Regions:
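S-adenosyl-L-methionine-dependent methyltransferase catalytic core, i.e., the SAM/SAH-binding region
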Residues: 1-316
Length: 316
């Protein structure tokens, strides 16, 4: 079962990336192709859209898009960190790179893949169904301390210790096989008043387990330098994040590249020789309008940051 895909901050992405006829743009997280389609429509027959996704179901959607747009297209089935590194290694240069981070709507809405706490399904949560590690293994084999750390660090879950302890106790009786079974354990571990505050009680735990299964933060840490190295001088990067762990990484990365001289303020002449290699394209993260959130509630937590590359300063 799937719902119609609605790309988040679609107009804002186009405004900041400014794709032009004849350019090369990389969509590092193709998903359902909503952003890619709008970008491709601006590239014209001489432009090139390179789409990346590790989910095999995305490739069929890409084939449909490729048959309908006039620009040249290329699909790479891989995680975006590895694909971007490979593109840099082969000497590809891009005028724009987009990373729409986190889980795609089509993955959430394919209930049997186990990403959602709202529907019963096998515990899976793999973006690439071919990888070995899945949510069932995390929940049923990782020790209590490791589970608590994952819940605390990747989900910013206040009750990480209580939930981890409850998971271990529950699996001693029988393995946790389904999303509903995990949800019930989480609910029982949280104090009653907290179950009705701040959204679904399993939201943060599911986020943490999904991030751990897919190595999402490690992927992002590898991908950002490669995405930047891929850009030509004057090229533009845009990143959409959906939680603070991602947003902080994107913010720090772009701010570091937009920073010029780092000498002490009392030094009369610059000694470091450092100049900015990026210009931030918005002072703060761009957020969805109330109208977009009303039309697409999943957009509520989205944050968009973008920068233009001023010079080829490398990836470090």
């Amino acid at each position: 079962m799937t719902r119609p895909h609605v790309p988040v901050l679609a107009d804002e992405v186009l405004d900041l990336l400014e794709p032009q006829p004849g350019e090369t743009v990389v969509d590092g997280t193709f998903g359902a192709g909503g952003h890619a389609r709008r970008i491709a429509e601006r590239l014209g027959p001489d432009g090139l859209l390179i789409a990346i996704d590790r989910d095999p179901t995305a490739e069929a959607r890409f084939d449909e898009l490729a048959a309908e747009v006039s620009c040249r297209t290329r699909f790479i089935r891989a995680d975006f960190a590895s694909a971007l590194e490979d593109l840099v290694a082969e000497g590809t240069r891009a005028d724009g790179v987009l990373l729409d981070l986190g889980i795609s709507s089509m993955q959430v809405d394919t209930f049997e893949r186990g990403f959602s706490y709202s529907y019963d399904a096998p515990l899976d949560m793999r973006m690439d169904p071919g990888q070995e590690l899945d949510a069932r293994e995390v929940v049923n084999t990782w020790d209590e301390r490791r589970l608590a750390r994952v819940l605390r660090e990747l989900g910013e879950e206040r009750y990480a210790k209580q939930i981890a302890r409850a998971i271990v106790r529950a699996r001693e009786q029988r393995p946790l096989e389904t999303t509903n079974a995990l949800v019930e354990v989480i609910k029982d571990a949280i104090p009653a008043p907290a179950r009705f505050a701040g959204g679904h009680p399993a939201k943060r735990a599911f986020q943490a387990i999904r991030i751990a299964v897919n190595g999402e933060l490690e992927q992002l840490d590898r991908a950002l330098p490669s995405a930047w190295a891929l850009l030509r001088e004057g090229g533009r990067f845009a990143g959409i994040s959906f939680h603070s762990l991602e947003d902080r990484r994107v913010k720090r990365f772009l701010a570091d590249r937009a920073r010029g001289c780092i000498c002490p303020p009392d030094l009369p002449v610059c000694a470091c020789g450092r100049t900015a290699e990026a210009a931030l394209l918005s002072r703060r993260a761009v957020q969805p309008t109330p109208e977009e959130i009303a039309d697409n509630p999943r957009a509520a937590s989205a944050r968009l940051r973008a920068a233009r590359k001023l010079r080829d300063g490398g990836s470090a």
